[in-house]
Amino acid sequence: MKQYLELMQKVLDEGTQKNDRTGTGTLSIFGHQMRFNLQEGFPLVTTKRCHLRSIIHELLWFLQGDTNIAYLHENNVTIWDEWADENGDLGPVYGKQWRAWPTPDGRHIDQITTVLNQLKNDPDSRRIIVSAWNVGELDKMALAPCHAFFQFYVADGKLSCQLYQRSCDVFLGLPFNIASYALLVHMMAQQCDLEVGDFVWTGGDTHLYSNHMDQTHLQLSREPRSLPKLIIKRKPESIFDYRFEDFEIEGYDPHPGIKAPVAI
């Protein structure tokens, strides 16, 4: 994961001081890309421990179309707590847009099922895309989508994916985002009888918060370790039938975790 550390250093070296919605302040760059060959290992940051339980359960929660944090709480995941209302609701965030994008005539589009069908029946299509950026519902969301738009691509029997992330918290959020979409590529590839290819991450406003600087320097002082391997123990009937127990990360030997405040 040297690419991730190189991005951190780039933001420190080249970033512009900016104000932000949270009032915290950031160092920010605009436009950056990283490519991870998923054949070479699972891209889980090793210079600090990442909470894999949260990453897996959040993705399963998205795929169910859920937008209430009850499921996350049942599985000891608290990463969305700060944005939920008193009933645990977040509004029409990722899961709603992925699974039930509303149309003007009252129907709903299941984008995940749509892209799966495209991958199986028209893998050369240039329209195998999922968007969470629904302009008509942004004002109803507790938090506008940060990882907003992703596209799948099939070549030589391998499935690749590119994500556009409009806003990226490099220290806290990005390790989760990389691992989450890498996991999704593995799951989609298994469902479509494909090998995994590359995960390409593209960032817009890519920033380090001003209260993450000490943590960033600590992480940069650590040497990356070998990437772990993802094992999926079974092939469920559909992309929506995976369970937490289906996944195993083999050989994950990270440095200790580093705590940092969340900008809300």
Curated annotation (Swiss-Prot):
Keywords: Cytoplasm, Methyltransferase, Nucleotide biosynthesis, Transferase. It catalyses: dUMP + (6R)-5,10-methylene-5,6,7,8-tetrahydrofolate = 7,8-dihydrofolate + dTMP. It is found in: Cytoplasm. GO terms for biological process: dTMP biosynthetic process; dTTP biosynthetic process; methylation. One of its GO terms (cellular component) is cytosol. InterPro entries: Thymidate_synth/dCMP_Mease, Thymidate_synth/dCMP_Mease_dom, Thymidate_synth/dCMP_Mease_sf, Thymidylate_synthase, Thymidylate_synthase_AS. Pathway: Pyrimidine metabolism; dTTP biosynthesis. Gene3D superfamilies: Thymidylate synthase/dCMP hydroxymethylase domain (3.30.572.10). Its EC number is 2.1.1.45. The keyword Transferase applies. DUMP binds at R21, R126, R127, R166, S167, C168, D169, N177, H207, L208, Y209. One of its GO terms (molecular function) is thymidylate synthase activity. It comes from the Bacteria. The active site is at C146 (nucleophile). (6R)-5,10-methylene-5,6,7,8-tetrahydrofolate binds at H51, D169, A263. CDD domains: TS_Pyrimidine_HMase. Homodimer. Belongs to the thymidylate synthase family. Bacterial-type ThyA subfamily. Catalyzes the reductive methylation of 2'-deoxyuridine-5'-monophosphate (dUMP) to 2'-deoxythymidine-5'-monophosphate (dTMP) while utilizing 5,10-methylenetetrahydrofolate (mTHF) as the methyl donor and reductant in the reaction, yielding dihydrofolate (DHF) as a by-product. This enzymatic reaction provides an intracellular de novo source of dTMP, an essential precursor for DNA biosynthesis. This is Thymidylate synthase. It comes from Escherichia fergusonii (strain ATCC 35469 / DSM 13698 / CCUG 18766 / IAM 14443 / JCM 21226 / LMG 7866 / NBRC 102419 / NCTC 12128 / CDC 0568-73). The lineage of its organism: Bacteria, Pseudomonadati, Pseudomonadota, Gammaproteobacteria, Enterobacterales.
